[in-house]
């Protein structure tokens, strides 16, 4: 965009002012044009030769038309508050003598008033290696003096290390042998790497770096060194206090343990039945309380733990009181040595709820899908149980058929002991099969 504007300005001035000298110095972008000549360095000549261009310049002084050879010389003066990090050298970087070029003198005129110590050829203010007043002033003189900035920085860091080593020895003598050991370790760390040093060491060197020249000797910095060592002493006393607290007495920590099943629930099987009685407010368990205990608290983790021993206790009841009919589950078999643990979400239902759902479906009160939505039993499991009881399975298991035949004469005795009518109805249906 700048190039187009410059070309337009060059063409306009070449058409209007044909009396200008074409051999006048021009920018590198407009050298291809033979008759191109931008605005001259003297504004009086531009106003006398080209009144239209003078009006444009008076209307907008910051426009790209104002980029001339004169402005390119004083270009660093416009970047007073900007830190130039480019690798190119400014026109005044090569001049190291006291007499500067006009471009360099304009930077000091437009910027902040510099001190006479800044015009020294080595860029230093005192003999101990203190850098210029600020980093911005150092870059304003050019990157030719960048090598002189690195050595004073190392020198200032060395000064801060010497001051801190003196204060460490004095504080270590007051703290005792443990303090000597701690301070010695910290001193080794501070000498090994720059990243291992605390923040206040660099702040001390930065204060020395950005000082106004009054702090030129080590003897001028005892107060600052003491202040810089004070937060270190406070930090170390805080750490020592924490160590004493850690070594004083063991603290009771609650460590979370991952456990699948609490074995203490097995010894308290009687408490499982009193759990629902506390919830329902009655001492005896009814069929409704068992149903609510198995269906409703599925979301709670405590009820998840209750589901395992609860079903085991109900299976133990069934094995002691006797089963009116065999089931396909291994849990219901009295000959099984140990009841099988429930696996997955499809075994989170209770066996009593399963029996009630099977009896409701077999009596014709509900369909399989309706019983699935109400009792929370999977459709395939409920359908298989119903077909197994009705004898409509295509491939009935041979082992279950043998158990049914062996338990056939004992069913009549078990019916009298069973108080539920649903179990009696299902037992009669199994006898008819």
Swiss-Prot record:
Transmembrane segments: none annotated. The modification Phosphoserine is found at residues 42, 63, 249. InterPro entries: Homeodomain-like_sf, HTH_Psq. Pfam families: HTH_psq. It is found in: Nucleus. Detected in heart and kidney. Keywords: Activator, DNA-binding, Isopeptide bond, Nucleus, Phosphoprotein, Repressor, Transcription, Transcription regulation, Ubl conjugation. Gene3D superfamilies: Homeodomain-like. There is a cross-link at residues 254, 414 (Glycyl lysine isopeptide (Lys-Gly) (interchain with G-Cter in SUMO2)). The keyword Transcription applies. Residues 13-34, 88-110, 316-329 have a biased composition (Polar residues). Residues 36-48 have a biased composition (Low complexity). Residues 368-388 bind DNA. Residues 340-392 form the HTH psq-type domain. One of its GO terms (biological process) is negative regulation of transcription by RNA polymerase II. A motif (Interaction with nuclear receptors) lies at residues 53-57. A motif (Nuclear localization signal) lies at residues 339-345. One of its GO terms (cellular component) is nucleus. Interacts with ESR1 and ESR2 in the presence of estradiol. Interacts with CTBP1, HDAC3 and HDAC6. Component of a large corepressor complex that contains about 20 proteins, including CTBP1, CTBP2, HDAC1 and HDAC2. Repressor of ligand-dependent transcription activation by various nuclear repressors. Repressor of ligand-dependent transcription activation by ESR1, ESR2, NR3C1, PGR, RARA, RARB, RARG, RXRA and VDR. May act as transcription activator that binds DNA elements with the sequence 5'-CCCTATCGATCGATCTCTACCT-3'. This is Ligand-dependent corepressor. It comes from Mus musculus (Mouse). The gene is Lcor.
């Amino acid at each position: 965009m700048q190039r187009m504007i410059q070309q337009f300005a060059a063409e306009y001035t070449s058409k209007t002012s044909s009396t200008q000298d074409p051999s006048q110095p021009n920018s590198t972008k407009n050298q291809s044009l033979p008759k191109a000549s931008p605005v001259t360095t003297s504004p009086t000549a531009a106003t006398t030769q080209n009144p239209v261009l003078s009006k444009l310049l008076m209307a907008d002084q910051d426009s790209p038309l104002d980029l001339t050879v004169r402005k390119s010389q004083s270009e660093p003066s416009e970047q007073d508050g900007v830190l130039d990090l480019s690798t190119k050298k400014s026109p005044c970087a090569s001049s190291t003598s006291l007499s500067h070029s006009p471009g360099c003198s304009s930077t000091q005129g437009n910027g902040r008033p510099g001190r006479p110590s800044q015009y020294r050829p080595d860029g230093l203010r005192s003999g101990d290696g203190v850098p210029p007043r600020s980093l911005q002033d150092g870059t304003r003189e050019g990157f030719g003096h960048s090598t002189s900035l690195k050595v004073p920085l190392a020198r200032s860091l060395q000064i801060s290390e010497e001051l801190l080593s003196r204060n460490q020895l004095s504080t270590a003598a007051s703290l005792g042998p443990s303090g000597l050991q701690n301070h010695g370790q910290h001193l080794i760390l501070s000498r090994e790497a720059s990243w291992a040093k605390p923040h206040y060491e660099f702040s001390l060197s930065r204060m020395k770096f950005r000082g106004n020249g009054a702090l030129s000797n080590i003897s001028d910095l005892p107060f600052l060194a003491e202040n810089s060592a004070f937060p270190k002493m406070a930090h170390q006393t805080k750490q020592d206090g924490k160590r004493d607290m850690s070594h004083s007495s063991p603290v009771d920590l609650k460590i979370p343990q991952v456990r699948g099943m609490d074995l203490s629930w097995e010894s308290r099987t009687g408490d499982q039945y009193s759990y629902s009685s506390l919830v329902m407010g009655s001492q005896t368990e009814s069929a409704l309380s068992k149903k609510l205990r198995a269906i409703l608290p599925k979301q709670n983790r405590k009820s998840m733990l209750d589901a395992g021993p609860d079903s085991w206790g109900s299976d133990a009841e069934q094995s002691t009181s006797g089963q009116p009919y065999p089931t396909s589950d291994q849990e219901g078999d009295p000959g099984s040595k140990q009841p099988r643990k429930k696996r997955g979400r499809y075994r989170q239902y209770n066996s009593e709820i399963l029996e009630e759902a099977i009896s409701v479906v077999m009596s014709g009160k509900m369909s399989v899908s309706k019983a699935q939505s109400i009792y929370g039993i999977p459709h395939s499991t409920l359908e298989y149980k119903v077909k197994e009881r009705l004898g409509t399975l295509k491939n009935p298991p041979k082992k279950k058929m043998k158990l049914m035949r062996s338990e056939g004469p004992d069913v009549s005795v078990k019916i009298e002991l069973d108080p539920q009518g649903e179990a009696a109805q299902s037992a009669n249906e199994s006898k008819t099969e």
